[in-house]
């Protein structure tokens, strides 16, 4: 019988700790599949965040380091400069990257560090119990915004891809999602392109994944996917925000 689908060698046999319906498992698989298909499993290092993905080093079958909160881009910068032949990437959530780690991600991008960041945007703080994140939508409820986010009080959500795309340093920025099979396929293509551009030494690459958090959104996994399509994506439009390989014909 022909094999239609099998587990990638890029993941260990450790049981994932993520909640049912969480998008991290899907993105982990995509990243691992791309690394395996590129032949980079023995040549990759991931910088793991503080947040729901804090144990990602147990799941990716590659070298990994756990970073201080928000400092994964700084850690990745040091690793890449010392080991430029390695494929180095950070894997971060919206609290780790867009709040406490804003300085690190902005300046790594501005410097054009030859690393890749996989950014999971689910609009909430997952690990700590559902507090409002920099990406929480207007009107969206959180434990620290029980009546819904009020832009007059809490400010507006940060569109990280758009913000970083204004900088000269990034080589490639794309926002994708995983709420449909077609979106998952596109997300995998974006991750592969980000890694390929890093291997070419062209600059900083960034893939934002609009994802889910059914537990802290207080909905079922199915409803969470619907919320992504109906509410998250309209505020965080999918697409390529910067690609110097197209702009410069590389």
Regions from the language model: what does each represent?
Residues 102-107, 127-141:
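Active-site-proximal loop->helix
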Residues 50-52, 122-124, 180, 208-216:
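Glycine-rich beta-alpha junction loops
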């Amino acid at each position: 019988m022909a094999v239609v689908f099998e587990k990638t060698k890029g993941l260990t046999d450790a049981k994932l700790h993520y909640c049912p319906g969480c998008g991290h498992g899907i993105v982990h698989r995509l990243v691992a599949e791309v690394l395996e298909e590129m032949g980079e499993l023995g040549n990759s290092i991931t910088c793991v965040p503080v947040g729901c993905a804090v144990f990602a080093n147990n799941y990716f079958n590659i070298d990994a380091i756990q970073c201080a909160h928000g400092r994964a881009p700084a850690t990745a910068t040091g690793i890449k400069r010392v080991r430029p032949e390695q494929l180095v990437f950070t894997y971060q959530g919206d609290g780790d990257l867009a709040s406490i780690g804003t300085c690190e991600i902005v300046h790594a991008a501005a410097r054009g560090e030859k690393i890749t960041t996989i950014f999971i945007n689910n609009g909430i703080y997952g690990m700590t119990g559902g507090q409002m994140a920099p990406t929480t939508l207007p009107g969206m409820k959180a434990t620290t915004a029980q009546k819904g986010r009020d832009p007059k009080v809490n400010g507006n959500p940060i569109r990280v891809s758009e913000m970083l795309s204004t900088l000269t340093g990034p080589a490639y920025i794309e926002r994708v999602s995983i709420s449909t099979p077609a979106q998952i396929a596109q997300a995998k293509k974006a991750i592969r392109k980000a890694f390929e551009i890093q291997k070419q030494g062209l600059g900083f690459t960034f893939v934002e994944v609009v994802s889910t958090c059914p537990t802290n959104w207080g909905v079922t996994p199915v409803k969470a996917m619907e919320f992504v399509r109906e509410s998250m994506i309209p505020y965080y439009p999918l697409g390529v925000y910067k690609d110097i390989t197209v702009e410069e014909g590389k």
